[in-house]
Amino acid sequence: MKFRIEKDSLGNVKVPEKALWGAQTQRAVDNFPISGIKMDFPFTKSFVSSLGLIKDAAAKANLKLKLISSKKSKAISKAAKEVWQEKHHNEFPIDVFQTGSGTSSNMNANEVIANLATKYSKVKISPNDDVNMSQSSNDVIPTAIKVSSHMDLTKKLYPALDLSLIHI
């Protein structure tokens, strides 16, 4: 396997050459292999999709507030839409059990979306400064849990139930 070198505040880290994630995601993969169950596991699809929805909404809100350029916002939205449409689900190698407030999952989404958005816009999109603008893992992750729960209830559980048997 070929690698590229990514840099962050902790220094250099080897990332698979074709991976859309960056240094912080790779560090989480390397340092926290807790369960072996990755974010690309089938039951996490709605969670990863909800991260894309949140990043899309944030990019549009930041544009409306004139905090980000139209070019960057559109590129982030395009990339985020691909994430919520499950086109890059294999780019989420983080273990489902992770430290803290889900920072690793949030950064994984930020890095994937930033790399896609950079490719689309030909302008450098920062995972922290652009994709994660006006957000915190403490807000993004609880929101993603709620959105993905709603998605799974409405798309999977409710259709599987025969609601005609319930008499209220």
Residue ranges and their predicted role:
Residues 1-166:
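Conserved, well-structured ligand/cofactor-binding cores
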